Structure formats: structure tokens, C-alpha cells
């Protein structure tokens, strides 16, 4: 079962290529700071602009660098089922601990199509699978009924990442799918309310910047200390907000550049932050006394 504090890791670039030195340093940073798992090649990892070869190489590199010290979850979804199967099979082959498979985007499948898609991936590849529900980007939402059917029939569908503000949906998933299924927040600002309803952790953007604090929030919530969890939530709330002042992952990668972790480099169609928003981000980071280097 996946739970705890999981980082949605950025993918650093340098001169147009994946910066593996910086990526290795980021992985070490999370090992040192007690993060429970890293997710590579997700939304925050700019997976849509990676080539197939880069995608596979990043996953393989992360698994080798982690060397069993921290779990590695690979983003392996796509809007073509055969591609999702291929990427998921590769993730298993190189030793990833699990796969995050996004709801197919753009082609807007029906619930039957979503069921067949995820069932095919789960049956073809025996690896723990997290369903990634993010309707703001996919334009379609997998229903709780469909998820319940999938989890009932496929033992390796073990969790969902929920990037939705719909708390009724979270309640329904927790109630119907039970303790053996992990609900993971996909939105830092909503992690605390989701965990109050029974979610078991977060796949976090803010974790790239302040992993120890996010880990403490999750620890407190899992132990039922919601007073402490609430204190940390409000302490981090300004960070949660500013990291989404522009499209993710633009602000968080810019924050990592300010902290000297990577270059400030994106691939089109993503571009650098506006100067105004970059200044807002810098002021928030200063508030937390973070060691700014750029």
C-alpha cells in the first residue's frame, strides 16, 4: 500500500537535455529528508514534453539512484492504452515500486472505456497501480463505481491520486473501497481535509521545496493528531498557494532554481514565470527563511 509523503518530482533540464546530475541530487535530497517515495515522470515532472526514450531513461535512472532507499513510483499513463501498457511494463522491468496511470486525456473515453483501459494495464503488467484522477487536465473523471469495479477485480489497483476538490467523492471512495485501498491527495491545499476523511497521504508539489514540513503534516494526520496537522497546514498554506500561481510545474521548478537545485529551464509550450509572479514566489520563499541562491 502506498501512503505517506510522496514527492511529485520535477525533471531538471540543462541545455535542452535532462540534467541527470541535478536529478540525482534531487533524489538524494529526498532520501536525506525522509520523503516516503518519489514520483517521476508525472505532471510535475513535465512528462508530456519528454520523449519516450527520455521517459524510460528517467525512470530507470531514478530506480538505480534510489537503490532501495526510497520507493520509486513511475508515471506511465497515456491516452493510448497500448502506450500505457508499454511504459508500465518498462517501469516494472527496471524495478519501479509502482505505477501512476493517469485517466486518458483529450479523447474523453466513456466509463466503459476507462474500465477497459485500466483493466488492460493491470492485467498486462503485475505492478501496484495508482489511478490518477485529474479532471481539470483530462476533461473526464473516472467514477467511483468504475474505480470500485476495477479495484474489486484487479488486486494490483491499490490506490488513487485525487486532484479534485470534491470531498463527497473522497468520502465515497474511502467508504466503498475500504482500508486496503489508499486515497492520496493530489493537491497540497486539500491534503489535510482529504486526510480527515480517510486519505492516507499526498503526492505533493510542495514536497520539492519543504519536504520535512510536508512529511510532518502527513505524520501528524496519520497518527490522528489533527491539531498539529492543522498548524502545519496553515504554516505552509502560503507556499501551497504560490506554487500554483501559474501552471504547475512552472512555479515549483522556479522555486527549485532559486534554491540552487536546478536550472530555470522548461520545454515549450511551458515558459518561464512572469517577472511579477516570480517576485511573489521569491517573497514567499523568503518568509520561510529558505536558502535562496538565485
Curated annotation (Swiss-Prot):
Give the enzyme class: lyase
Note the InterPro entries from the entry.
Aldolase_TIM, DapA, DapA-like, Schiff_base-form_aldolases_AS, Schiff_base-form_aldolases_CS
Q: Which GO terms describe its molecular function?
A: 4-hydroxy-tetrahydrodipicolinate synthase activity
Q: Which domain of life is it from?
A: Bacteria
Where is it mainly found? cytoplasm
What pathway, per the record?
Amino-acid biosynthesis; L-lysine biosynthesis via DAP pathway; (S)-tetrahydrodipicolinate from L-aspartate: step 3/4
Task: Give the EC number.
Answer: 4.3.3.7
Name the keywords, alphabetized. Answer: Amino-acid biosynthesis, Cytoplasm, Diaminopimelate biosynthesis, Lyase, Lysine biosynthesis, Schiff base
Could you name the active-site residues? 132, 161
Task: Please tell me where pyruvate binds in this chain.
Answer: 44, 203
Keyword Amino-acid biosynthesis set for record: yes
Q: Which reaction does it catalyse?
A: L-aspartate 4-semialdehyde + pyruvate = (2S,4S)-4-hydroxy-2,3,4,5-tetrahydrodipicolinate + H2O + H(+)
Q: Name one GO cellular component term.
A: cytosol
* Function as written in the Swiss-Prot or TrEMBL entry: Catalyzes the condensation of (S)-aspartate-beta-semialdehyde [(S)-ASA] and pyruvate to 4-hydroxy-tetrahydrodipicolinate (HTPA).
Tell me the subunit arrangement: Homotetramer; dimer of dimers.
Q: What is this protein called?
A: 4-hydroxy-tetrahydrodipicolinate synthase
The coding gene here is: dapA
Amino acid at each position: 500500500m502506498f501512503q505517506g509523503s510522496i514527492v511529485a518530482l520535477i525533471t531538471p533540464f540543462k541545455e535542452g537535455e535532462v540534467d541527470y546530475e541535478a536529478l540525482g541530487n534531487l533524489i538524494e535530497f529526498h532520501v536525506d529528508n525522509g520523503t516516503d517515495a518519489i514520483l517521476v515522470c508525472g505532471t510535475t515532472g513535465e512528462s508530456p514534453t519528454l520523449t519516450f526514450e527520455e521517459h524510460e531513461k528517467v525512470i530507470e535512472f531514478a530506480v538505480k539512484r534510489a537503490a532501495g532507499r526510497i520507493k520509486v513510483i513511475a508515471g506511465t499513463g497515456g491516452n493510448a492504452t497500448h502506450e500505457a501498457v508499454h511504459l508500465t511494463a518498462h517501469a516494472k522491468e527496471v524495478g519501479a515500486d509502482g505505477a501512476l496511470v493517469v485517466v486518458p486525456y483529450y479523447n474523453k473515453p466513456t466509463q466503459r472505456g476507462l474500465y477497459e483501459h485500466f483493466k488492460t494495464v493491470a492485467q498486462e503488467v503485475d505492478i501496484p497501480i495508482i489511478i490518477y484522477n485529474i479532471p481539470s487536465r483530462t476533461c473526464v473523471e473516472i467514477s467511483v463505481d468504475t474505480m470500485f469495479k476495477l479495484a474489486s477485480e484487479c488486486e494490483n489497483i491499490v490506490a488513487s491520486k485525487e486532484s479534485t476538490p470534491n470531498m463527497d467523492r473522497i468520502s465515497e471512495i474511502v467508504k466503498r473501497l475500504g482500508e486496503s485501498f489508499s486515497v492520496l491527495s493530489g493537491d497540497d491545499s486539500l491534503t489535510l481535509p482529504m486526510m480527515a476523511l480517510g486519505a492516507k497521504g499526498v503526492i505533493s508539489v510542495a514536497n520539492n521545496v519543504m519536504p520535512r514540513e510536508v512529511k510532518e503534516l502527513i505524520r501528524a494526520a496519520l497518527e490522528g493528531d489533527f491539531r498539529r496537522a492543522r498548524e502545519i497546514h496553515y504554516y505552509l498554506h502560503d507556499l501551497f498557494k504560490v506554487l500554483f500561481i501559474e501552471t504547475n510545474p512552472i512555479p515549483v521548478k522556479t522555486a527549485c532554481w532559486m534554491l540552487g537545485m536546478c536550472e530555470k529551464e522548461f520545454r515549450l509550450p511551458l515558459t518561464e514565470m512572469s517577472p511579477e509572479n516570480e517576485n511573489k514566489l521569491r517573497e514567499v520563499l523568503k518568509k520561510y527563511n529558505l536558502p535562496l541562491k538565485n
